[in-house]
Regions:
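Beta-strand elements of well-folded, non-transmembrane domains
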Residues: 10-14, 34, 59
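Short, charge-patterned binding micro-sites
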Residues: 3, 42-61, 90
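Short glycine-/aliphatic-rich beta-strand segments at the starts of folded cytosolic domains
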Residues: 4-14, 18
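C-terminal structural segments of small proteins and small subunits
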Residues: 58-92
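A short linear hydrophobic-aromatic micro-motif
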Residues: 37-43, 83-87
Length: 92
């Protein structure tokens, strides 16, 4: 059994408040859960233009886990509401 982990730091240039950030982040989290069936977590909660999203998936084959994590990163790169600052991927 393999576990895939992806941590993505994003910058939200249009977010002028924590409320606006929450709207954008909740939308991202919901879409990612529905589209890719993965677990999503967010931090820090107190900064209004920076977010760190962590994604985790589990599968029996390493190839499937790597593909899923790559699809998540690729999907997020083409969203227009934020910029990806950093991306870290690991498979255990």
């Amino acid at each position: 059994m393999f576990i895939g982990y992806c941590k993505i730091n994003i910058f939200l240039p249009e977010s002028l408040s924590l409320k606006k950030k929450r709207q954008v982040i909740l939308g991202i989290k919901d879409r990612m859960r529905r589209r890719f069936n993965i677990a999503v977590a967010e931090k820090p909660l107190d900064k209004w233009q920076i977010a760190e999203l962590s994604f985790v998936c589990v599968n029996y084959t390493r190839r499937c886990v790597e593909e899923q994590i790559s699809k998540v990163e690729e999907y997020l790169r083409f969203q227009g509401k934020f910029h990806i600052i950093d991306c870290e991927k690991q498979v255990f």
